[in-house]
Amino acid sequence: VSLYNQTNEIPIKPTPVIGMVGSNQDLKKINSNKFCNIGNKILVLGKQLEKNLSPYLLQDQNLASNINEYNDLEELDLDYEKKVADCVLKMSDFKYIMSCNDISRGGVFLSLLKMQYKDMGFKVNIPDPIDLFCEYSAGYVIEIRNEDLNNVSSFLSKNGVGYFEIGEIIKENIEINSKKFDYFDIINNYHNNFEKIIN
């Protein structure tokens, strides 16, 4: 934590960094963080997607003046976080989950980009595409086989964990609400736009 722990006369709340390691006795139970098969379904576990769960959008729209104000808006529910994480682990044991990525940093959209692999892209339908940028620590993007949807739905409902289906894995393309995007254009903008703006 910086000794000068404030900016613009507003204090910056300290953020402890915790490093963790774990052990796994069965290599077959380790899930991929990359898409596995074209045609599989994509689900989001956790709360419903909402704009106010994106700190960057709130700042961009002047709804929150800084990250500190956003942090005050989002109240942690550690019990729910553990419940969702436990469900992910159990579904992994049941071999329902083919791949998985959390949405705690960068939201659903960044998780989907990270999960792209080889010639596999994704097609999703979201009522408001801005919701793709919402992020929270108790949320996960998971890939499941079509035939496992009923079992996954029953398991999550029984354990009180929300979920919703957002799309499927397709060949190469990125489609959001039927609009196509180029993966390499997105990555190029992500890495280079800031430099263009400040020059």
Show the residue positions of the predicted features:
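Glycine-/charge-enriched secondary-structure boundary and capping motifs
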Residues: 1-17, 70-72, 85-199
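Glycine- and other small-residue-rich loops at beta-strand/loop junctions that grip anionic moieties
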Residues: 34, 77, 101
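Glycine-/acidic-rich phosphate or pyrophosphate-binding loops and their flanking alpha/beta elements
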Residues: 26-38, 58-62, 83-91, 125-130
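Gly-rich Lys/Arg/Thr-decorated short loops/hinges at beta-loop-alpha junctions or inter-strand turns
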Residues: 50-75
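C-terminal transmembrane module of polytopic alpha-helical membrane proteins
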Residues: 76-83
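Glycine-rich anion-binding loops of enzyme active sites
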Residues: 1-54, 165-168
